[in-house]
Amino acid sequence: MQAMVLAVVQGLTEFLPISSSGHLSIVSKLFFGSDAGASFTAVTQIGTELAVVIYFAGDIVRLVVTWFRGLVNAEVRRTQDYRLAWYVIVGSLPIGVLGFLFQDYIRGALRSLWITGAMLILFGILMGLAERFGAQRRGHDKLTMRDGVLMGSAQALALIPGVSRSGGTITAGLSLGLDRPTAVRFSFLLAIPAVFAAGVSEVSHVFEPSAHGLQPTGAQMIVATVVAGVVGYAVIAWLLRYVQKHSVYLFVWYRIVLGLVLFGLLGFGVIQP
């Protein structure tokens, strides 16, 4: 039951800029008495990233084919798709390197709900500032390597629960002058290599007797991952439509209010950090 509930939470929150890992930690501690754990979070993210792969299958195939063709064809190397493929590759490096170097902190100390609450509020404010002051004039065809590096670096901050991978990358994209739909779409593409790598590397840790957090059976883990993916697919479709006509202020205020509520719950001892 716990694994299914948390899978739905994962699917609902993975692509919204409100921190899926933060929500998993809050819900699991508040309703089930213990943290779901970084390993469970990482593995269920495979399901949500499969949703991205299915949703953007056409884009992904085009980028992969163009990238391989560009390795041997100078004319192809001048296309935007070839450059975009490199932006995704380079932008995925920061989170991979930092995730490897600081994996013990990610599974342990950084999962304090005090940190989660602070990051929810801080990055909510930063997202609001990016929405308010970002130029939002550059579309998909204006993406650069600088965008890939800086948005990839922002993605790495999501190793801290409460930051939000999509929240960090969308905030960075808006700050760099990208329009909202472009920032969101590139955020999704940027996540695929890093999240799949993290999920695969954590599969064995979920079932270790000494592992921190939830320890589901193999069957429960598979079902939870599928559920997270199905819910996540619906959220992708909704979010892409939403940002076409709406600002991200809804998520800004949600993050700030949730962070304040979390501080209140911690302060009154309703939930343990």
From Swiss-Prot:
The EC code for this enzyme is 3.6.1.27
The superkingdom listed in its UniProt entry is Bacteria
Please give the Gene Ontology molecular function terms for this protein.
undecaprenyl-diphosphatase activity
User: Does Transmembrane appear among the keywords?
Assistant: yes
Membrane topology summary = Multi-pass membrane protein
> Which segments cross the bilayer?
4-24, 40-60, 84-104, 109-129, 186-206, 220-240, 251-271
Recorded GO CC terms? plasma membrane
State the reactions this protein catalyses.
Answer: di-trans,octa-cis-undecaprenyl diphosphate + H2O = di-trans,octa-cis-undecaprenyl phosphate + phosphate + H(+)
User: What is any one GO biological process for this UniProt entry?
Assistant: regulation of cell shape
Query: Keywords in UniProt for this one?
Result: Antibiotic resistance, Cell membrane, Cell shape, Cell wall biogenesis/degradation, Hydrolase, Membrane, Peptidoglycan synthesis, Transmembrane, Transmembrane helix
Locations listed in the record: Cell membrane
Extra remark: Bacitracin is thought to be involved in the inhibition of peptidoglycan synthesis by sequestering undecaprenyl diphosphate, thereby reducing the pool of lipid carrier available.
Return the similarity comment. Answer: Belongs to the UppP family.
Role: Catalyzes the dephosphorylation of undecaprenyl diphosphate (UPP). Confers resistance to bacitracin.
Q: What is this protein called?
A: Undecaprenyl-diphosphatase
Q: Which organism is it from?
A: Saccharopolyspora erythraea (strain ATCC 11635 / DSM 40517 / JCM 4748 / NBRC 13426 / NCIMB 8594 / NRRL 2338)
